[in-house]
């Protein structure tokens, strides 16, 4: 059987096409394998680099662990460019050499240094010592209280802004007028009137650092410890300036000095004297301001009340009717109230302070929840007033009873 010539040619052409297709497919497969290998190689290279980095870090950590500890010392005097007299932490004084890595200008009396165990040479200069308790008093996050969240204290807010905010933000105004800006402000008044709230609002409204101290934290057991903490607090404030120091319950450390003293009373008086010295010491036009709060101004030492220490003494009294109404509006702003005449409630809340009004609003909400409602009515507020007033009267009766018993 014979085939046409063109048939043979077609077969040969198809065979060549098939062969060419197989070659292309094989090449494509090879290229794909090469690409996968290249990607795998890159991954291995990256892992290798990462392992080398980790290995270097571990080696450095191991070297640190192998280095013997250094001895702490305090510089007493620098003899020349390469020698100094140092008091070691173990007790004796040494004349030691300075390492080439230490700048001679950093070796000053009182500087903390590290000494080599073998040669006692100065190998490092440490930063100034700081009391961790003073560092912990700085607020990293600003409080969330604004002046608009405080009701019934418009005059007091104006006064504290003039004393604290204005000298920090516009000190040139005082220079133009030719007066010295106030150094500090003392807030006094019954508990719950908003003294601490004012300090929080100042911290929020200014860009200054804020150091909060409770007076009892400055009272320590051992001699000189409280005074050292006071020094460290003011040193921290200067380093963080502009800064505001807020001393809450200052009567714990600044009560009147008497002649009959126990050991604890003497230490409190030493702390007070250090506080007085620090308040006199910092620059009045500097960026450090002090705010203090107390509900017992009658027991404060006269020395701390004189002008130059607390230049402005602001009374935070119980609010009047308009002030109570303003406070009720602030606390009920996010409450679901229905047909409530806040003016009437404010009239009924006579002699109440801000903390009492907040308690009334909370109790009114609790009465509504107890009855299964999602809104608060006038009845809830009236019942809350009776409940909070009853608690307050019982508390005052208890205090009067204790006063009668113990004088």
Curated annotation (Swiss-Prot):
InterPro entries: 26S_Proteasome_ATPase (IPR050221), AAA+_ATPase (IPR003593), AAA_lid_3 (IPR041569), ATPase_AAA_core (IPR003959), ATPase_AAA_CS (IPR003960), NA-bd_OB-fold (IPR012340), Nucleotidase_PAN (IPR023501), P-loop_NTPase (IPR027417). The keyword Coiled coil applies. Signal peptide: none annotated. Pfam families: AAA, AAA_lid_3, Prot_ATP_ID_OB_C. The keyword Protease does not apply. GO terms for molecular function: ATP binding; ATP hydrolysis activity. ATP binds at residues 192-197, 331. GO terms for biological process: proteasomal protein catabolic process; protein unfolding. Residues 22-67 form a coiled coil. ATPase which is responsible for recognizing, binding, unfolding and translocation of substrate proteins into the archaeal 20S proteasome core particle. Is essential for opening the gate of the 20S proteasome via an interaction with its C-terminus, thereby allowing substrate entry and access to the site of proteolysis. Thus, the C-termini of the proteasomal ATPase function like a 'key in a lock' to induce gate opening and therefore regulate proteolysis. Homohexamer. The hexameric complex has a two-ring architecture resembling a top hat that caps the 20S proteasome core at one or both ends. Upon ATP-binding, the C-terminus of PAN interacts with the alpha-rings of the proteasome core by binding to the intersubunit pockets. This is Proteasome-activating nucleotidase. It comes from Methanococcus vannielii (strain ATCC 35089 / DSM 1224 / JCM 13029 / OCM 148 / SB). The lineage of its organism: Archaea, Methanobacteriati, Methanobacteriota, Methanomada group, Methanococci. The gene is pan.
């Amino acid at each position: 059987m014979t085939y046409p010539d063109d048939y043979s040619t077609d077969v040969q052409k198809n065979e060549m096409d098939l062969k060419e297709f197989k070659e292309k497919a094989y090449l494509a497969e090879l290229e794909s394998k090469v690409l996968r290998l290249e990607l795998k190689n890159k991954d291995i290279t990256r892992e290798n680099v990462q392992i080398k980095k980790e290995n270097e870090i571990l080696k450095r950590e191991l070297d640190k662990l192998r280095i013997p500890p250094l001895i702490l010392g305090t510089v007493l005097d620098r003899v020349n460019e390469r020698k100094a007299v140092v008091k070691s932490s173990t007790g004796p004084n040494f004349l030691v050499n300075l390492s080439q890595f230490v700048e001679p200008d950093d070796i000053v009396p009182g500087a903390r240094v590290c000494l080599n165990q073998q040669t006692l040479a100065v190998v490092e200069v440490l930063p100034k010592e700081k009391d961790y308790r003073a560092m912990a008093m700085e607020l990293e996050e600003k409080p969330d209280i604004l002046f608009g969240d405080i009701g019934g204290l418009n005059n007091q807010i104006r006064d504290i802004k003039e004393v604290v905010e204005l000298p920090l933000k516009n000190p040139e105004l005082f220079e133009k007028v030719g007066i010295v800006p106030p150094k500090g402000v003392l807030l006094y008044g019954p508990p719950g009137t908003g003294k601490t709230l004012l300090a929080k609002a100042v911290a929020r409204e200014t860009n200054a650092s804020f150091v909060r101290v409770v007076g009892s934290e400055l009272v320590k057991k051992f001699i000189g410890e409280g005074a050292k903490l006071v020094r460290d607090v003011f040193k921290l404030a200067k380093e963080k300036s502009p800064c505001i120091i807020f001393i809450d319950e200052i009567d714990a450390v600044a009560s009147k000095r008497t002649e009959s003293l126990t050991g604890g009373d003497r230490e409190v008086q030493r702390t007070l004297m250090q506080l007085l010295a620090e308040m006199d010491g910092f620059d009045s036009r500097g960026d450090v301001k002090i705010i203090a709060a107390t509900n017992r101004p009658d027991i404060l030492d006269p020395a701390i009340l004189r002008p130059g220490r607390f230049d402005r003494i602001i009374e935070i009294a119980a609010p009047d009717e308009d002030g109570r109404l303003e406070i009720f509006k602030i606390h009920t702003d996010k409450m679901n109230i229905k047909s409530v005449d806040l003016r009437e409630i404010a009239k009924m809340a006579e002699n109440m302070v801000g903390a009492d009004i907040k308690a009334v609003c909370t109790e009114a909400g609790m009465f509504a929840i107890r009855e299964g409602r999602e809104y608060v009515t006038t009845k809830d507020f009236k019942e809350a007033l009776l409940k909070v007033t009853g608690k307050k009267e019982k508390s005052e009766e208890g205090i009067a009873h204790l006063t009668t018993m113990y004088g």
